[in-house]
Amino acid sequence: MITRIPRSSFSANINNTAQTNEHQTLSELFYKELEDKFSGKELATPLLKSFSENCRQNGRHIFSNKDFVIKFSTSVLQADKKEITIINKNENTTLTQTIAPIFEKYLMEILPQRSDTLDKQELNLKSDRKEKEFPRIKLNGQCYFPGRPQNRIVCRHIAAQYINDIYQNVDYKPHQDDYSSAEKFLTHFNKKCKNQTLALVSSRPEGRCVAACGDFGLVMKAYFDKMESNGISVMAAILLVDNHALTVRLRIKNTTEGCTHYVVSVYDPNVTNDKIRIMSESKENIKHYSLMDFMNVDYSLLKWSNDHVINQSVAIIPALPKEQLLMLKGSVDEITPPLSPATMNLLMAIGQNHQLTQLMIQLQKMPELHRTEMLTAYNSINLPGLYLAINYGNADIVETIFNSLSETGYEGLLSKKNLMHILEAKDKNGFSGLFLAISRKDKNVVTSILNALPKLAATHHLDNEQVYKFLSAKNRTSSHVLYHVMANGDADMLKIVLNALPLLIRTCHLTKEQVLDLLKAKDFYGCPGLYLAMQNGHSDIVKVILEALPSLAQEINISASDIVDLLTAKSLARDTGLFMAMQRGHMNVINTIFNALPTLFNTFKFDKKNMKPLLLANNSNEYPGLFSAIQHKQQNVVETVYLALSDHARLFGFTAEDIMDFWQHKAPQKYSAFELAFEFGHRVIAELILNTLNKMAESFGFTDNPRYIAEKNYMEALLKKASPHTVR
């Protein structure tokens, strides 16, 4: 464990030097000592001596101790020159000087290249399964135990466990022994905390923010201010850097001597039984510390640490008890993060809308290539920021992105290709953000996207093919996103999408073929989503589609035959959804369709030619669903079909001959519906068919029709026979 406390001898040196150089800052004095050392002058260098003895290397070109930070970088103005930046944490002063490369090389040689005094131990959870080993990933605190990938423990799990210990232990301090070995940690680890970090991010607590790693101390100081004003002595937070997670613990300690100490401890799951702690008697001193001051990795992890931690932004998400949730409201409103892809990714992930809105305005001034990179905002595992925002349910973030891009200030700033790349926000498997939102049943996110899409399409002049591709939300090997909605019976989500279509048709000029394709929602193999909805008895899905058709017809020319094709679309097995609904007895689906017949007649001019396919529901072998219902003893289905014909025959213009044609319709096996019922011994269904025919003959006045008389006599004669196997 590393503890940073003031050293009296070092403070004395600084004070003595400051007294002899009243008009120079300590940063300037430090630089003067470096120059003197480089030139070979035999002069005292107390600042350099103390720094060399107490500093550690935080990056390839970064050194620091409790008072100073030295950074080396390439000069922005002179590519052949180097720059040295000296930051004095106590005075809050910064000095930058252009130097020759040989000067940098000399200083790099005299400063310690790494800290060998730290007690570091890699987290190394070994497999108990000897027969099959899986690779362990040391970086990012990720390992497999007991040897299977599905049992992996990643850094966010360990960081969350550490926070639990902070609040659960009596002294608000985790017992480091619990983290000292793989065995002890696994004994201590609570598997319930595996989803805790994700839940914390999704809950969007007050005080969350994204800051430059160099401004980490500023955020800690802001938290200490709120803690003091609310009388709270301990709090914890999760730190997210790229896809790595750490834990920070803040503590205000009042000593018996009347002093107040402000303590910041950072625990990194990359190492065990170790944390770095900085203590100060002044909150103002805390704000000078960077996250790099708390990093404790050995040389083998140094490059990873530089690339993915200390040189990036950090998301800080307070983890407070429920009664303290509002304590940090407004505490970090003044924190301005750097404009970088890492920042944008974290802002979208944690739902920090205030900071994101400010950066979206700044993006308009950047070149398109950089602007696209910022808005796509991939992290190191190729997940775009917008995808993460959708994953965590940050509807306001999604709305900010889409609405900002819809403003005239962005018109012409992005090519259509780059814009679609940003909006689709695909993961590494090619699934878009819209696909994710609909799959997660996140109505708020989907509504935000669909509401903003018409204006965005108008601003950037997107054509109907681009909008259609966005709405279909599929990759080259996936099903249409609405296929999953219909198959799973998510009527509310389907209604949200269909309600947005009329405006999209009007503004984006979607064609009838594109709209009907969205409604059919086929999977990769061509099976329609509506087929599965009917097969599974999801009548709400059928109802939502039927209710949406009239409003869609006002925008595009949908015909009666189009609707019949939609309702009778076939699966790979060449059955229709209505065929399967009749076979399985899904009365709710059948009633929903037949109850909509008057509306279909009035709106789409349905006639008897359109009605008959719905009554019979043939499969590709011309075998009717009505006959399949008879075969499977679905008496209610048979009764409903004949009742629908009886109720609507006059409306649809059926004549006596049409009715008799329906009654005498034969399957490929040459049976009529009555004969099939009789053949299978379903006498009740056979009598139902006969009685319905008699009622319709009386109602329509064709009791003297020769076809009717002959059919009636034939059916009555069959019913009087003892054996069913006597059909003609």
Swiss-Prot record:
Keywords: ANK repeat, Repeat. It holds the Pfam family Toxin_15. It comes from the Bacteria. The keyword Magnesium does not apply. SMART domains: ANK (SM00248). Gene3D superfamilies: Ankyrin repeat-containing domain (1.25.40.20). ANK repeats lie at residues 381-410, 429-458, 477-506, 525-554, 573-602. The keyword Membrane does not apply. PANTHER family: ANKYRIN REPEAT FAMILY PROTEIN, PROTEIN PHOSPHATASE 1 REGULATORY SUBUNIT. Belongs to the Toxin_15 family. This is Ankyrin repeat protein A. It comes from Escherichia coli (strain K12).
